[in-house]
Amino acid sequence: ISCSLVGSEMCIRDRGKTVLSLVGLGYVGMPIAVAFAKKVKVIGFDLNAEKISLYKSGIDPTNEVGNEEIKSSKVEFTANEIDLRKAKFHIVAVPTPVNADHTPDLTPVEGASTILGRNLTKGSIVVYESTVYPGVTEDICVPILEKESGLKCGIDFKVGYSPERINPGDKEHRINNIVKIVSGMDEETLDVIAKVYELVVEAGVHKAESIKVAEAAKVIENSQRDINIAFMNELSIIFNKMGIDTKSVLEAAGTKWNFLKFYPGLVGGHCIGVDPYYLTYKAEALGYHSQIILSGRRINDDMGKYVAENLVKHLIKAEKPVKNAKVAILGFTFKENCPDTRNTKIIDIVKELREYGIEPIISDTTCLLYTSPSPRDCS
Protein backbone atom coordinates (compact mmCIF):
# COMPACT_ATOMS: atom_id res chain seq x y z
CA ILE A 1 0.00 0.00 0.00
CA SER A 2 1.21 3.47 -0.82
CA CYS A 3 2.23 5.66 2.09
CA SER A 4 1.80 8.89 0.15
CA LEU A 5 -1.72 9.58 1.39
CA VAL A 6 -0.94 10.21 5.01
CA GLY A 7 2.81 10.51 5.00
CA SER A 8 5.49 8.30 6.48
CA GLU A 9 4.01 8.48 10.00
CA MET A 10 0.96 6.51 8.93
CA CYS A 11 2.75 3.98 6.72
CA ILE A 12 1.22 0.65 7.67
CA ARG A 13 4.47 -1.15 7.04
CA ASP A 14 6.23 0.97 9.66
CA ARG A 15 4.09 0.37 12.74
CA GLY A 16 6.67 1.78 15.10
CA LYS A 17 6.01 5.27 13.76
CA THR A 18 2.27 4.91 13.36
CA VAL A 19 0.22 7.14 15.67
CA LEU A 20 -3.55 6.72 15.82
CA SER A 21 -6.02 8.74 17.86
CA LEU A 22 -9.34 7.65 19.29
CA VAL A 23 -11.76 10.49 20.02
CA GLY A 24 -14.38 9.36 22.55
CA LEU A 25 -13.53 6.69 25.14
CA GLY A 26 -16.88 5.19 26.04
CA TYR A 27 -18.38 1.73 25.52
CA VAL A 28 -17.37 1.82 21.85
CA GLY A 29 -14.19 3.85 21.79
CA MET A 30 -12.41 2.21 24.70
CA PRO A 31 -12.29 -1.35 23.28
CA ILE A 32 -11.12 0.04 19.93
CA ALA A 33 -8.34 2.06 21.54
CA VAL A 34 -7.09 -0.89 23.60
CA ALA A 35 -7.16 -3.21 20.58
CA PHE A 36 -5.15 -0.84 18.39
CA ALA A 37 -2.69 -0.09 21.20
CA LYS A 38 -1.47 -3.68 20.90
CA LYS A 39 -0.35 -2.90 17.35
CA VAL A 40 0.40 0.82 17.10
CA LYS A 41 0.80 3.94 19.23
CA VAL A 42 -2.63 5.21 20.35
CA ILE A 43 -3.73 8.58 21.72
CA GLY A 44 -6.98 8.06 23.64
CA PHE A 45 -8.82 11.38 23.94
CA ASP A 46 -11.96 12.22 25.88
CA LEU A 47 -13.32 15.55 27.11
CA ASN A 48 -14.23 13.97 30.44
CA ALA A 49 -11.10 14.54 32.52
CA GLU A 50 -12.53 12.48 35.37
CA LYS A 51 -12.97 9.50 33.05
CA ILE A 52 -9.40 9.92 31.81
CA SER A 53 -8.22 9.92 35.43
CA LEU A 54 -10.04 6.63 36.02
CA TYR A 55 -8.44 5.05 32.96
CA LYS A 56 -5.01 6.22 34.06
CA SER A 57 -5.70 4.63 37.45
CA GLY A 58 -6.53 1.33 35.79
CA ILE A 59 -10.29 1.53 36.31
CA ASP A 60 -12.68 0.71 33.48
CA PRO A 61 -16.08 2.33 34.17
CA THR A 62 -17.53 0.76 31.01
CA ASN A 63 -16.62 -2.80 32.03
CA GLU A 64 -16.06 -3.47 28.32
CA VAL A 65 -12.34 -4.05 28.60
CA GLY A 66 -11.76 -4.71 32.28
CA ASN A 67 -9.44 -3.16 34.83
CA GLU A 68 -6.54 -5.51 34.13
CA GLU A 69 -6.59 -4.72 30.40
CA ILE A 70 -6.68 -1.01 31.16
CA LYS A 71 -3.73 -1.27 33.54
CA SER A 72 -1.60 -3.12 31.00
CA SER A 73 -2.72 -1.06 28.01
CA LYS A 74 -0.27 1.26 26.28
CA VAL A 75 -2.95 3.77 25.32
CA GLU A 76 -1.85 7.36 26.02
CA PHE A 77 -4.96 8.68 27.79
CA THR A 78 -5.50 12.42 27.61
CA ALA A 79 -8.09 15.16 27.93
CA ASN A 80 -5.75 17.64 26.23
CA GLU A 81 -6.82 18.11 22.62
CA ILE A 82 -3.35 19.30 21.61
CA ASP A 83 -2.17 15.69 21.90
CA LEU A 84 -4.32 14.82 18.89
CA ARG A 85 -1.75 16.57 16.71
CA LYS A 86 0.60 13.63 17.25
CA ALA A 87 -1.64 11.39 15.13
CA LYS A 88 -2.31 11.15 11.41
CA PHE A 89 -5.14 8.61 11.59
CA HIS A 90 -8.13 9.61 13.69
CA ILE A 91 -11.14 7.53 14.73
CA VAL A 92 -14.21 9.31 16.11
CA ALA A 93 -16.47 7.19 18.34
CA VAL A 94 -18.78 9.54 20.22
CA PRO A 95 -22.47 9.04 21.11
CA THR A 96 -25.24 10.07 18.73
CA PRO A 97 -28.38 10.36 20.91
CA VAL A 98 -31.77 11.87 20.08
CA ASN A 99 -33.53 14.92 21.44
CA ALA A 100 -36.78 14.81 23.42
CA ASP A 101 -38.72 15.07 20.14
CA HIS A 102 -36.80 12.07 18.73
CA THR A 103 -34.81 14.17 16.26
CA PRO A 104 -31.07 13.44 15.93
CA ASP A 105 -28.79 15.17 18.41
CA LEU A 106 -25.56 15.59 16.48
CA THR A 107 -23.99 17.81 19.14
CA PRO A 108 -21.40 15.19 20.24
CA VAL A 109 -20.23 14.35 16.72
CA GLU A 110 -20.19 18.03 15.73
CA GLY A 111 -18.22 18.86 18.87
CA ALA A 112 -15.74 16.08 18.18
CA SER A 113 -15.31 17.35 14.63
CA THR A 114 -14.67 20.86 15.92
CA ILE A 115 -12.00 19.69 18.35
CA LEU A 116 -10.40 17.42 15.78
CA GLY A 117 -10.49 20.14 13.15
CA ARG A 118 -8.57 22.50 15.41
CA ASN A 119 -5.81 19.93 15.67
CA LEU A 120 -5.89 18.36 12.22
CA THR A 121 -2.66 18.29 10.22
CA LYS A 122 -2.04 17.80 6.52
CA GLY A 123 -2.00 14.21 5.31
CA SER A 124 -4.44 12.95 7.95
CA ILE A 125 -7.36 10.55 7.63
CA VAL A 126 -10.46 10.93 9.79
CA VAL A 127 -12.77 7.93 10.21
CA TYR A 128 -16.16 8.26 11.90
CA GLU A 129 -17.67 5.28 13.72
CA SER A 130 -20.67 6.98 15.34
CA THR A 131 -24.07 5.81 14.10
CA VAL A 132 -25.64 8.48 11.89
CA TYR A 133 -28.06 8.82 9.01
CA PRO A 134 -26.57 8.69 5.49
CA GLY A 135 -24.87 11.96 4.62
CA VAL A 136 -23.72 13.16 8.03
CA THR A 137 -20.02 12.41 7.50
CA GLU A 138 -19.72 14.28 4.21
CA ASP A 139 -22.42 16.95 4.61
CA ILE A 140 -22.00 17.91 8.27
CA CYS A 141 -18.67 16.66 9.62
CA VAL A 142 -16.42 17.51 6.67
CA PRO A 143 -17.43 21.21 6.53
CA ILE A 144 -16.66 21.51 10.25
CA LEU A 145 -13.26 19.86 9.80
CA GLU A 146 -12.45 22.20 6.91
CA LYS A 147 -13.60 25.32 8.76
CA GLU A 148 -11.67 24.57 11.94
CA SER A 149 -8.49 23.33 10.27
CA GLY A 150 -8.30 25.67 7.31
CA LEU A 151 -7.52 22.57 5.25
CA LYS A 152 -9.31 21.19 2.19
CA CYS A 153 -10.87 17.73 2.27
CA GLY A 154 -9.68 15.57 -0.59
CA ILE A 155 -6.47 17.56 -0.89
CA ASP A 156 -5.06 18.12 2.60
CA PHE A 157 -6.91 15.36 4.44
CA LYS A 158 -9.29 12.49 3.70
CA VAL A 159 -12.33 11.01 5.46
CA GLY A 160 -14.02 7.65 5.80
CA TYR A 161 -16.70 5.88 7.76
CA SER A 162 -16.57 2.53 9.55
CA PRO A 163 -19.66 1.88 11.69
CA GLU A 164 -19.09 0.54 15.18
CA ARG A 165 -20.46 -2.91 15.90
CA ILE A 166 -19.57 -3.18 19.57
CA ASN A 167 -22.29 -4.94 21.56
CA PRO A 168 -21.98 -3.72 25.19
CA GLY A 169 -21.76 -6.55 27.68
CA ASP A 170 -21.13 -9.16 24.98
CA LYS A 171 -17.87 -10.96 25.75
CA GLU A 172 -18.16 -13.29 22.75
CA HIS A 173 -18.55 -10.86 19.86
CA ARG A 174 -15.59 -8.51 20.10
CA ILE A 175 -13.89 -6.11 17.70
CA ASN A 176 -11.45 -8.79 16.53
CA ASN A 177 -14.07 -11.36 15.48
CA ILE A 178 -16.77 -9.13 13.96
CA VAL A 179 -16.49 -8.29 10.25
CA LYS A 180 -15.80 -4.55 9.94
CA ILE A 181 -17.50 -2.40 7.33
CA VAL A 182 -15.11 0.22 5.98
CA SER A 183 -15.58 3.04 3.50
CA GLY A 184 -13.59 5.96 2.18
CA MET A 185 -14.08 9.05 0.07
CA ASP A 186 -11.95 7.50 -2.67
CA GLU A 187 -10.26 4.20 -3.47
CA GLU A 188 -6.87 5.18 -2.08
CA THR A 189 -8.41 6.26 1.23
CA LEU A 190 -10.53 3.11 1.38
CA ASP A 191 -7.45 0.93 0.93
CA VAL A 192 -5.58 2.68 3.74
CA ILE A 193 -8.56 2.49 6.11
CA ALA A 194 -9.05 -1.19 5.32
CA LYS A 195 -5.38 -1.94 6.02
CA VAL A 196 -5.50 -0.09 9.33
CA TYR A 197 -8.54 -1.99 10.60
CA GLU A 198 -7.13 -5.29 9.37
CA LEU A 199 -4.43 -4.83 12.01
CA VAL A 200 -6.98 -5.66 14.72
CA VAL A 201 -9.99 -7.23 12.97
CA GLU A 202 -9.20 -10.90 12.41
CA ALA A 203 -12.64 -11.51 10.88
CA GLY A 204 -11.73 -9.22 8.00
CA VAL A 205 -13.25 -6.10 6.51
CA HIS A 206 -16.05 -5.44 4.05
CA LYS A 207 -15.37 -2.56 1.69
CA ALA A 208 -18.56 -0.57 1.14
CA GLU A 209 -18.85 1.23 -2.17
CA SER A 210 -19.37 4.61 -0.54
CA ILE A 211 -19.50 6.39 2.79
CA LYS A 212 -23.28 6.79 2.53
CA VAL A 213 -23.70 3.04 1.91
CA ALA A 214 -21.71 2.29 5.08
CA GLU A 215 -23.74 4.83 7.08
CA ALA A 216 -27.00 3.33 5.83
CA ALA A 217 -25.85 -0.23 6.54
CA LYS A 218 -25.23 0.58 10.18
CA VAL A 219 -28.49 2.40 10.81
CA ILE A 220 -30.58 -0.43 9.33
CA GLU A 221 -28.77 -3.10 11.38
CA ASN A 222 -30.25 -1.73 14.57
CA SER A 223 -33.54 -0.72 12.94
CA GLN A 224 -34.08 -4.28 11.75
CA ARG A 225 -33.54 -5.66 15.23
CA ASP A 226 -35.82 -3.03 16.74
CA ILE A 227 -38.63 -3.92 14.33
CA ASN A 228 -38.30 -7.65 14.95
CA ILE A 229 -38.37 -7.20 18.72
CA ALA A 230 -41.41 -4.93 18.33
CA PHE A 231 -43.16 -7.74 16.43
CA MET A 232 -42.40 -10.15 19.27
CA ASN A 233 -43.63 -7.62 21.82
CA GLU A 234 -46.88 -7.18 19.94
CA LEU A 235 -47.31 -10.94 19.73
CA SER A 236 -46.75 -11.22 23.48
CA ILE A 237 -49.52 -8.67 24.08
CA ILE A 238 -51.89 -10.58 21.80
CA PHE A 239 -51.06 -14.01 23.21
CA ASN A 240 -51.34 -12.69 26.76
CA LYS A 241 -54.93 -11.68 26.03
CA MET A 242 -55.53 -15.16 24.62
CA GLY A 243 -54.06 -16.85 27.66
CA ILE A 244 -51.29 -18.43 25.57
CA ASP A 245 -47.66 -18.62 26.71
CA THR A 246 -45.57 -16.62 24.23
CA LYS A 247 -42.34 -18.50 24.92
CA SER A 248 -44.04 -21.80 24.15
CA VAL A 249 -45.36 -20.39 20.88
CA LEU A 250 -41.92 -19.15 19.84
CA GLU A 251 -40.32 -22.45 20.80
CA ALA A 252 -42.78 -24.33 18.59
CA ALA A 253 -42.48 -21.89 15.67
CA GLY A 254 -38.69 -21.97 16.00
CA THR A 255 -38.60 -25.58 14.83
CA LYS A 256 -39.01 -24.31 11.26
CA TRP A 257 -35.63 -23.71 9.62
CA ASN A 258 -36.34 -20.18 8.42
CA PHE A 259 -38.13 -18.80 11.48
CA LEU A 260 -36.12 -15.88 12.86
CA LYS A 261 -35.44 -16.17 16.57
CA PHE A 262 -36.31 -12.96 18.34
CA TYR A 263 -37.90 -12.55 21.76
CA PRO A 264 -40.08 -9.99 23.58
CA GLY A 265 -38.24 -7.51 25.75
CA LEU A 266 -37.52 -3.96 26.81
CA VAL A 267 -35.59 -2.06 24.14
CA GLY A 268 -33.41 0.60 25.72
CA GLY A 269 -29.83 1.78 25.51
CA HIS A 270 -28.06 4.13 23.16
CA CYS A 271 -28.36 2.09 19.95
CA ILE A 272 -31.39 -0.02 19.06
CA GLY A 273 -33.95 2.31 20.61
CA VAL A 274 -32.31 5.42 19.15
CA ASP A 275 -30.89 4.67 15.70
CA PRO A 276 -34.23 4.10 13.91
CA TYR A 277 -35.10 7.74 14.58
CA TYR A 278 -32.01 8.81 12.62
CA LEU A 279 -33.25 6.94 9.57
CA THR A 280 -36.85 8.16 9.82
CA TYR A 281 -35.64 11.74 10.36
CA LYS A 282 -33.75 11.70 7.08
CA ALA A 283 -36.64 9.95 5.32
CA GLU A 284 -39.08 12.64 6.49
CA ALA A 285 -36.69 15.35 5.32
CA LEU A 286 -36.98 13.77 1.87
CA GLY A 287 -40.77 13.66 2.04
CA TYR A 288 -41.35 10.07 3.13
CA HIS A 289 -43.11 9.22 6.38
CA SER A 290 -42.05 5.85 7.77
CA GLN A 291 -44.78 3.27 8.33
CA ILE A 292 -43.11 0.17 9.77
CA ILE A 293 -40.10 1.69 11.54
CA LEU A 294 -42.03 4.22 13.63
CA SER A 295 -44.77 1.70 14.40
CA GLY A 296 -42.14 -0.59 15.86
CA ARG A 297 -40.70 2.26 17.88
CA ARG A 298 -44.09 3.11 19.38
CA ILE A 299 -44.65 -0.50 20.43
CA ASN A 300 -41.22 -0.81 22.06
CA ASP A 301 -41.44 2.58 23.75
CA ASP A 302 -44.73 1.56 25.38
CA MET A 303 -43.54 -1.77 26.77
CA GLY A 304 -42.42 -0.36 30.12
CA LYS A 305 -45.95 0.86 30.78
CA TYR A 306 -47.36 -2.47 29.60
CA VAL A 307 -45.13 -4.43 32.00
CA ALA A 308 -46.18 -2.23 34.94
CA GLU A 309 -49.87 -2.57 34.11
CA ASN A 310 -49.54 -6.34 33.95
CA LEU A 311 -47.84 -6.38 37.33
CA VAL A 312 -50.72 -4.42 38.83
CA LYS A 313 -53.21 -6.87 37.31
CA HIS A 314 -51.34 -9.77 38.92
CA LEU A 315 -51.44 -8.01 42.29
CA ILE A 316 -55.19 -7.60 41.97
CA LYS A 317 -55.67 -11.24 40.96
CA ALA A 318 -53.60 -12.30 43.96
CA GLU A 319 -55.84 -10.09 46.13
CA LYS A 320 -52.89 -7.97 47.22
CA PRO A 321 -53.37 -4.26 47.98
CA VAL A 322 -51.95 -2.29 45.05
CA LYS A 323 -51.09 0.94 46.85
CA ASN A 324 -47.82 0.65 48.77
CA ALA A 325 -47.35 -2.91 47.49
CA LYS A 326 -43.86 -4.30 47.99
CA VAL A 327 -42.41 -4.68 44.51
CA ALA A 328 -38.80 -5.51 43.64
CA ILE A 329 -37.21 -4.98 40.25
CA LEU A 330 -34.10 -7.05 39.62
CA GLY A 331 -31.99 -5.12 37.15
CA PHE A 332 -31.83 -1.43 36.27
CA THR A 333 -29.36 -1.05 33.40
CA PHE A 334 -30.67 -1.16 29.84
CA LYS A 335 -29.41 -4.73 29.35
CA GLU A 336 -27.78 -7.55 31.27
CA ASN A 337 -24.06 -7.60 32.13
CA CYS A 338 -23.66 -3.93 31.23
CA PRO A 339 -23.44 -0.95 33.64
CA ASP A 340 -24.93 1.47 31.08
CA THR A 341 -28.18 3.08 32.26
CA ARG A 342 -28.83 5.27 29.22
CA ASN A 343 -32.43 5.06 28.01
CA THR A 344 -33.20 2.18 30.36
CA LYS A 345 -36.88 1.24 30.18
CA ILE A 346 -36.91 0.35 33.87
CA ILE A 347 -37.50 4.05 34.45
CA ASP A 348 -40.75 3.78 32.47
CA ILE A 349 -41.84 0.87 34.67
CA VAL A 350 -41.04 2.81 37.84
CA LYS A 351 -42.92 5.91 36.67
CA GLU A 352 -46.00 3.86 35.84
CA LEU A 353 -45.91 1.97 39.15
CA ARG A 354 -45.73 5.27 41.01
CA GLU A 355 -49.02 6.22 39.36
CA TYR A 356 -50.52 3.32 41.32
CA GLY A 357 -48.87 4.33 44.59
CA ILE A 358 -46.09 1.75 44.32
CA GLU A 359 -42.47 2.67 45.09
CA PRO A 360 -40.45 -0.31 43.85
CA ILE A 361 -37.15 -1.49 45.27
CA ILE A 362 -34.49 -1.83 42.58
CA SER A 363 -31.43 -4.06 42.73
CA ASP A 364 -28.65 -4.25 40.14
CA THR A 365 -25.11 -5.31 41.00
CA THR A 366 -23.75 -4.26 37.59
CA CYS A 367 -25.11 -0.73 37.79
CA LEU A 368 -22.27 1.55 38.80
CA LEU A 369 -21.91 5.29 38.42
CA TYR A 370 -18.26 6.34 38.26
CA THR A 371 -18.72 9.90 39.42
CA SER A 372 -15.60 9.71 41.55
CA PRO A 373 -12.55 7.41 41.80
CA SER A 374 -14.70 5.21 44.05
CA PRO A 375 -17.73 3.75 42.25
CA ARG A 376 -21.11 4.04 43.92
CA ASP A 377 -24.31 2.19 43.18
CA CYS A 378 -27.21 3.58 41.20
CA SER A 379 -29.25 4.49 44.26
Predicted region positions:
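NAD(P)+-binding Rossmann beta1-loop-alpha1 motif at the extreme N-terminus of oxidoreductases
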Residues: R13-S57, A328-Y356
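Interdomain hinge/lid region at the active-site interface
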Residues: K212-E215, S223-P321, A325
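Short acidic low-complexity segments
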Residues: S73-A87, S372, R376-S379
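Rossmann-like NAD(P)(H) cofactor-binding subdomain of soluble oxidoreductases
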Residues: I82, V98-R165
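Single conserved hydrophobic/aromatic residue that forms the stacking wall/gate
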Residues: I1-I12, Y370-S379
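Internal alpha-helical scaffold of NAD(P)-dependent oxidoreductase catalytic cores
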Residues: P143-S162, I166-N258, K282-L286
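A short, aliphatic-rich alpha-helical micro-motif
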Residues: L5, I70, E81-A87, L120, ...
